Design a protein with these regions (language model features):
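Exposed, low-structure sequence patches enriched in small/polar residues
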Residues: 22-24, 34-38, 195-581
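Short alpha-helical segments and helix-capping/turn motifs at coil-helix boundaries
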Residues: 38, 69-74, 112-116, 159-163, ...
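Surface-exposed coil loops of outer-membrane beta-barrel proteins
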Residues: 22-26, 88-168, 175-195, 275-316, ...
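Outer-membrane beta-barrel proteins
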Residues: 59-68, 152-154, 222-236
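Transmembrane beta-strand segments of Gram-negative outer membrane beta-barrel proteins
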Residues: 15-37, 45, 50-54, 83-85, ...
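Bacterial Sec-dependent N-terminal signal peptides
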Residues: 1-20, 577, 581
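Outer membrane beta-barrel
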Residues: 45, 50-137, 245-268
Length: 581
């Protein structure tokens, strides 16, 4: 009888417990010495109203960031009707992220998670959340010692607590958020090496839902204080506005987004200096951007990096269908800083004119604009898929000089200007075989634009390109070509050959790529081509193995306006193994 009772108790307990997880192992080594070996293990244990998440990492070293051998993240959750409690590593978003949007974006090694406690209460018309904890955020900057592209060299800690409230009245949703952080901010000044800061964020939000449209807006105020001897002194204040309007029609929808961030007005040279300029936009905010995040390789490499402290912009997105088999997408986005900038008689930057609440293409305000459109076709009973697009982007990266007198102006800035055509094609055969091809063509201009005017006469208005041919002659454009071709047999395996080609070399990049036997076998120029082949095999429905050999170009990788440079990978292997259990 005793054994029966014990067996019954174990059976009931087991029936109430569920366990799941996944693992991912990645190993790579190139001929240039680039090496990483990392394994991530996620486990989820659920018992009744409790859920436990643990992430283990074993890396020596990881692809990006510092090595960890042990527990990386953990969280315990209790969910009982309207009440939810979380303890451990928290990743939360309030509204659209103007006050709080903590993320773990491993492809660019960006982790703004909070280790602490949060308590939430929800019912159909009211919700509230309190949060308290600490976040240690690592970033890369050239303004601190030890900069490199693989490991962050600047580390800041924040002790946070805050409150978020949402109230629903019919179709109207009202919100209020408050978040305060006590920051330990390392600086390069003597005798102080760390500053004590207090950052406060307040926001009000409103949204409205309707059958044919929805609307959201949020206004945020920022105040920062610096502890000086025995009291808090005001350091800075700013504000921000975000708006989103979606219109729904029978065959298409229109999405409009607007940002107006005015946390700080920092000169063009120092605007990304996170060491010496502090108390403004915080890394745990991660608000929306007025930029389309391109999924195509060549367009993502030249993505616009948003200045979250000071940027005004909008994005208009039209999406719909001409028929059941033809869909379209068109996006236009534009932004600039809130003021234009000019140099004084000592060649020091100062604010010039405040611009309109809508952006315009004034080079002295470091503008950006991007147009993208695509058509998608599905035919032959959805066996054939074709997507063709066109992108036209222009981005003034840095303002280098702008001196203005009564009779003259001298203006110099760095600019990126590109036109890109992506084409995707796939065809699925009836026996499980399929083929897929991706082709991207890009005409890229990049360099320094010089404009000179005297006595109403234009003396110079031209681009000095950074692209050179083999004889050292400057070329107006670089042509980039990205091609991939995949053959697959569902559900077991796929084989992909990828070629990434540039027509010329940038004048400031002198490193020569290492000989890749695959490129040599194909008889292509190894200085301007990166070729690799990848084999993927599904061992079981829950286990996937991948093997890549060859070279990867690297370059800029951006997510939500935050960018990081990924180093090239020359003549090497990458091995991956992922499982789900």
């Amino acid at each position: 009888m005793k054994n029966i009772i014990i067996f019954g108790a174990i059976s009931v307990a087991y029936a109430q417990v569920s366990f799941s997880g996944n693992t991912e192992t990645r190993l790579a080594e190139s001929s240039s010495g680039y090496y990483y070996n990392e394994t991530l293990i996620n486990t989820n244990l659920q018992y009744d109203a409790f859920t436990n998440w643990i992430q283990l990492e074993y890396s020596d070293p990881p692809e990006l960031g510092r090595g960890i051998n042990g527990v990386r993240k953990m969280r315990l959750e209790y969910d009982n009707g309207p009440v939810k409690l979380k303890l451990g590593d928290l990743y939360e978003i309030w509204g659209r992220g103007l006050v709080l949007n903590s993320v773990d974006d491993q492809p660019i090694d960006r982790d703004t998670g909070i280790r602490g406690l949060t308590l939430m209460y929800n019912n159909p018309s009211f919700s509230t959340q309190v949060i308290a904890g600490k976040t240690d955020i690592s970033q890369s900057t050239i303004n601190a010692l030890g900069f490199n592209n693989r490991t962050h060299n600047y580390h800041v800690s924040h002790n946070l607590y805050g409150l978020n409230i949402q109230k629903l009245l019919g179709n109207h949703d009202f919100g209020f958020s408050f978040l305060q952080g006590l920051e330990k901010h390392p600086v390069n000044t003597f005798p102080e090496d760390t500053l004590n800061l207090k950052n406060q964020l307040h926001s009000l939000s409103y949204s409205y839902m309707h059958s044919v449209f929805d609307f959201y807006t949020e206004y945020i105020m920022n105040r920062s204080y610096e502890f000086d001897e025995d009291r808090w002194s005001s350091h800075g204040k700013g504000k921000g506005l975000y708006g989103n309007l979606n219109l729904y029609f029978n065959l298409f929808s229109l999405n409009l987004e607007y940002i107006n961030y005015r946390y700080a007005m920092i000169d063009p040279i120092s605007r990304f200096n996170i060491v010496d300029y502090y108390g403004y936009n915080q890394p745990y905010q991660n608000p929306p951007v007025a930029v389309h995040i391109h999924e195509n390789v060549l367009m993502n490499r030249i993505s616009h990096q948003t200045d979250f402290n000071n940027e005004v912009g909008y994005k208009a997105e039209l999406i719909g269908s001409f028929s059941d088999n033809i869909e379209f997408l068109s996006i236009f986005s534009q932004s600039n800083r809130t003021h234009s900038w000019v140099m004084d008689e000592n060649f020091m930057w100062k604010k010039d004119k405040e611009l309109s609440f809508l952006p315009k293409f004034d080079p002295a305000a470091m503008p950006f604009k991007d147009f993208y459109t695509e058509l998608t076709f599905r035919t032959l009973q959805n066996k054939m898929f074709i997507k063709v697009g066109y992108a036209d982007m222009k981005d003034i990266i840095d303002l280098l000089q702008n001196t203005v007198t009564d009779t003259s102006q001298s203006l110099t800035y760095s600019i990126t200007d590109a036109q890109t055509i992506p084409l995707n094609f796939s065809y699925s055969f009836s026996n499980g075989w399929s083929i897929e091809s991706k082709i991207e063509l890009q005409w890229l201009s990049k360099g320094y634009w010089w404009y000179e005017e005297k006595n109403n006469q234009i003396i110079a208005d031209s681009l000095m390109s950074i692209f050179l041919d083999d004889n050292g002659k400057r070329l107006d454009q670089e042509k980039n070509t990205f091609i991939s071709f995949t053959v697959s047999k569902s559900p077991k395996w796929s084989l992909t050959l990828t070629s990434d080609k540039a027509s010329v070399k940038e004048s400031f990049l002198e490193n020569k790529s290492i000989v890749n036997p695959l490129e040599k076998f194909l008889g292509i120029d190894q200085e301007r081509n990166w070729v690799n082949v990848e084999f993927v095999y599904h061992i079981t429905s829950s286990m996937r193995f991948s093997l890549l050999y060859g070279s990867l170009k690297g370059g800029l990788l951006c997510t939500n306006g935050v960018c990081r440079i990924i180093e090239p990978f020359d003549d090497g292997f990458k091995i991956g193994l992922s499982t789900v259990f």
